[in-house]
């Protein structure tokens, strides 16, 4: 008996909210094929929209020739994702105001209609006030930077919880955190800055909606729009951070800048730990997860690999066909930059450059790379 877990994108609407995860438990072992991917995409659409429609365009897949599903979790990948750290992160985040474990919902009627044993989705529409799993990442990395700064300045070890309530605002109030975003990561950083007591400057590109910009401004962030794509906004944020002595809280990484993005993505593993507990011993055979720069996909891959070892599921990474930097990188066996308009309905996935940290994990651990 096979099973499938799908992690949906951060902007798929479900009755006005955001759907984050979909799990499918199948009656039979699923061989990976274009047809299988098409079926799973239909499951995702059903879970998100509550009605069926066709996926327009050709689905292209590439199998990773470097994959060894029998391998245990490599020691050298722990510097990018380490499941043993998740409980300490979870203990901190549980103390934040408004924390609650988000539900894994059983879509029994849809499963029955499709003759599937079980379908679940991880409903992140209830994650803090941001209604996104991204709340676990940018805000956590922001808190970590402030925690380290205050510990140095006071010459004593403080917890992230100690930052709440404005106790150290006199030390942190003039610090500026910055990032580039398509929306939800920037909201997470802005929320973290407001929660833990520092300033925030967010860079957005030309395709980010005014509503998303307003949402970040409502959290106290200064928002700067540039005339370029997401990757251009990443470069601009990094350049201005040097010029104005700001700290970049990015969810993408590159050689020489890996530690803060690791904090961002390790925050996401809190959601994955919840999923493992909620599955109550069941293990999916396949996991479908969307990707932009690859941060979430890498955490899904690495965390489940570390927890389930050689019993881990196959990880299928899904990208827009016009922004398939991970698939092209997998074909070549090294990071590849995809240029052009990167046009896609899923603006949050319109990324042309792979995150350095994410690539280290996905190059070894992902099974297939699919574009839609």
Q: What are the residue ranges of the model-derived segments?
A:
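Short hydrophobic targeting helices and cationic amphipathic motifs
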Residues: 5, 19, 27-29, 33, ...
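Intrinsically disordered, low-complexity segments enriched in small polar residues
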Residues: 2-9, 16, 21
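Residues marking helix boundaries in flexible regions
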Residues: 8, 13, 38-41
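PLP-dependent amino-acid enzyme catalytic core
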Residues: 47-372
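N-terminal leader/targeting signatures
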Residues: 28, 37-39, 49, 58
């Amino acid at each position: 008996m096979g099973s499938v877990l799908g992690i949906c994108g951060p902007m798929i609407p479900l009755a006005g909210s955001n759907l984050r995860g979909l799990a499918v438990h199948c009656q039979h072992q699923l061989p990976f094929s274009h047809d299988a991917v098409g079926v799973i995409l239909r499951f995702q659409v059903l879970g998100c929209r509550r009605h069926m429609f066709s996926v327009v365009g050709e689905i292209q897949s590439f199998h990773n020739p470097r994959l060894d599903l029998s391998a245990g979790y490599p020691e050298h990948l722990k510097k990018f994702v380490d499941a043993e750290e998740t409980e300490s992160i979870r203990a901190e985040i549980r103390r934040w105001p408004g924390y609650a474990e988000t539900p894994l919902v059983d879509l029994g009627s849809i499963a029955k209609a499709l003759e599937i044993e079980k379908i679940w989705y991880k409903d992140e529409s209830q994650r803090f006030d941001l209604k996104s799993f991204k709340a676990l990442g940018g805000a956590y990395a922001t808190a970590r930077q402030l925690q380290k700064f205050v510990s140095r300045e006071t010459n004593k070890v403080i917890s992230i919880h100690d930052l709440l309530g404005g106790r150290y605002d006199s030390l942190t109030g003039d610090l500026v955190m910055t990032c580039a975003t398509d929306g939800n990561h920037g909201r997470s950083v802005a929320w973290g800055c407001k929660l833990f007591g520092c300033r925030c400057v967010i860079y957005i590109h030309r395709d980010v909606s005014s509503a998303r910009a307003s949402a970040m401004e409502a959290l106290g962030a200064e928002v700067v729009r540039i005339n370029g794509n997401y990757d251009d906004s990443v470069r601009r944020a990094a350049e201005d951070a040097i010029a104005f002595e700001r700290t970049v809280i990015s969810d993408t990484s590159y050689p020489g800048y890996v530690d803060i993005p690791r904090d961002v993505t390790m925050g996401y593993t809190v959601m994955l730990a919840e999923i493992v507990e909620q599955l109550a011993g069941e293990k999916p055979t396949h996991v479908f997860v969307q990707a932009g720069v690859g941060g979430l996909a890498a955490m899904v891959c690495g965390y489940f690999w570390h927890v389930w070892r050689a019993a881990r599921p196959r990880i299928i990474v899904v990208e827009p066909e016009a922004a398939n930097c991970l698939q092209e990188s997998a074909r070549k066996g090294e990071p590849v930059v995809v240029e052009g308009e990167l046009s896609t309905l899923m603006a949050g996935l319109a990324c042309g450059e792979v995150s350095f940290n994410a690539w280290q994990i996905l190059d070894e651990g992902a099974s297939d790379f699919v574009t839609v």
